[in-house]
């Protein structure tokens, strides 16, 4: 009996690991264009600002597509659906690698965004299903770890490949790695019938849960604030702090590395007091932004701020996702789809707000505005916490 139990634990952990790898590859491809923007612009003889529109387009496609695409796929067996998503993901990366003009590249990115929309709508609930019985919370932490590793390893490796070969090779390699992950998924995952996915009828039911709606608004507010600053952190460090490109790269690496610590802290502390955990994580996101300009020339302080900020945003993202699942156990996929859409509204809005701040006030002010949006989100958290204290 002990061998059977050990075998179960081993396979369950391997399945969680496959989902973590999947999170890694999806998050890598979402943000790797940032590291390749100049090279892509040069190859198409375009301005970087114009090419950057594909990042905005990606976020908005995910925002608009998450819920309707999840509903369309609600009754499909989950393993089959995942393999289809990876097929679309891989084919779109092949098209990215072969793109003969910017519009073809944009179309390929939209294909990837469609896969992303459904993947993140169903993955959180699935990783909890396949995890060992006593490791559900840790499984969600491992999923977030995969996302963090995309920032630590995925983006730097993507840039290195792009510099050594070309940007097309980066997309080709991502497609190749995704193929290996899909094979692992096909081999390791059991049949996963759709369960508690929810239907279109679930949407009005969820909308009648005020705390859940409050959490979605909180996600939009705090992520908008985060990406108001984070979208332009690289030019801030180079132009305002006047640190070298190598130091800038190291700081971005530290930000990603901090995500690992954030995942660990979530696994250890969230269950003890979820409300305080979310509030503390938000403070870790807000304070470094507000103080970014104040300590702009103190290298070690900026490193510390970046590290704490990275811990905060990773911890907060997982905690809010877990809270959504707890508030909607009867429609986990619909709830996750709305969460993913809300998160990407925050990404797109934050990048837009940051651009407006830079043009109207200057690059040095992004942290103040991003932090101010975060403070509004913190006040909103306080309000819904008091109003729905027993929920």
Swiss-Prot record:
Molecular functions per Gene Ontology: carbohydrate transmembrane transporter activity
Gene name linked to the record: sotB
Keywords, sorted A to Z: Cell inner membrane, Cell membrane, Membrane, Sugar transport, Transmembrane, Transmembrane helix, Transport
Subcellular location: Cell inner membrane
4Fe-4S is among the record's keywords: no
Name used for this protein in its record: Probable sugar efflux transporter
Cellular component annotations (GO), alphabetically ordered: plasma membrane
PANTHER family to which the protein is assigned, alphabetical: PURINE EFFLUX PUMP PBUE (PTHR43124), SUGAR EFFLUX TRANSPORTER (PTHR43124:SF4)
Lineage: Bacteria, Pseudomonadati, Campylobacterota, Epsilonproteobacteria, Campylobacterales
InterPro entries for this protein: MFS, MFS_dom, MFS_Efflux_Transporters, MFS_trans_sf, Sugar_effux_transptr_put
Function: Involved in the efflux of sugars. The physiological role may be the reduction of the intracellular concentration of toxic sugars or sugar metabolites.
Membrane-topology annotation of the record: Multi-pass membrane protein
Family the UniProt entry places it in: Belongs to the major facilitator superfamily. SotB (TC 2.A.1.2) family.
Domain of life: Bacteria
